[in-house]
């Protein structure tokens, strides 16, 4: 029991030193971040694995300790990597109109709603978005273990074929610009979904504007 208490205290101390505090986007309340969850789960899994491989009580405790330390390092590593990247993107994109969302422990989503970066019906990238994308590229370049998928979306105005092509072209324009900002082409892909994935009501002007968007998914390599 004393051993497990020390183990848990150690994992919480480790996460307290390393983890970046996150807050819920809706409530503003502090959340347990990915690094903290990863360290704790990794430590417990490592301890359990180590405990069942020892020959006697002392050996099992020793193996459990080593397993906990190794599990904590692995479990917290990826989560911490994304916690830091998320924090940098929030700081970089404040007041830009681009939303930063955490989809899960190891996936981020940047949302450029309301046609940000493009004129109506056009796939030419507007110069007004260059500075924002420069900031995104600068952050991404510091995290080489992630990859990007740029997804283009339209509202329901116009025909399906036109919308599909427009969504693909806009996604490729953002992809091309980021590659021009030193993001390696092997780290980024572009896809278009036309009007197939609305996130707002296409029956209203505001809803259609919301659906005209480009999203950048950030995933582990």
Predicted regions, residues:
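C-terminal motif of bacterial Sec signal peptides marking the signal peptidase cleavage site
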Residues: 14-16
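Amphipathic, membrane-active segments
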Residues: 83-112
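Periplasmic OmpA-like peptidoglycan-binding domain that tethers envelope proteins to the cell wall
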Residues: 151-221
């Amino acid at each position: 029991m004393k051993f497990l208490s020390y183990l848990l205290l150690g994992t919480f101390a480790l996460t307290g030193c390393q983890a970046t505090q996150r807050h819920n986007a809706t409530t503003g309340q502090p959340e347990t971040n990915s690094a903290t969850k990863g360290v704790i789960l990794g430590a417990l899994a490592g301890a359990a694995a180590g405990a069942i491989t020892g020959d006697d009580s002392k050996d099992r405790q020793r193996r459990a300790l080593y397993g906990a330390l190794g599990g904590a390092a692995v479990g917290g590593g990826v989560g911490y990597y994304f916690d830091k990247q998320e924090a940098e993107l929030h700081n970089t994109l404040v007041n830009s109109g681009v939303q930063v969302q955490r989809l899960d422990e190891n996936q981020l989503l940047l949302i450029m709603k309301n046609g940000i970066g493009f004129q109506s019906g056009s796939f030419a990238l507007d110069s007004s978005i260059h500075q924002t994308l420069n900031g995104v590229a600068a952050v991404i370049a510091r995290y080489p273990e992630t990859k990007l998928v740029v997804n283009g979306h339209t509202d329901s105005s116009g025909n399906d074929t036109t919308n599909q092509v427009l969504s693909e072209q806009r996604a490729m324009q953002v992809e091309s610009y980021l590659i021009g900002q030193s993001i390696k082409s092997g780290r980024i892909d572009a896809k278009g979904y036309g009007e197939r994935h609305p996130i707002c009501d296409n029956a209203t002007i505001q809803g259609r504007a919301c659906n005209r968007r480009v999203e950048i998914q950030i995933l582990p390599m």
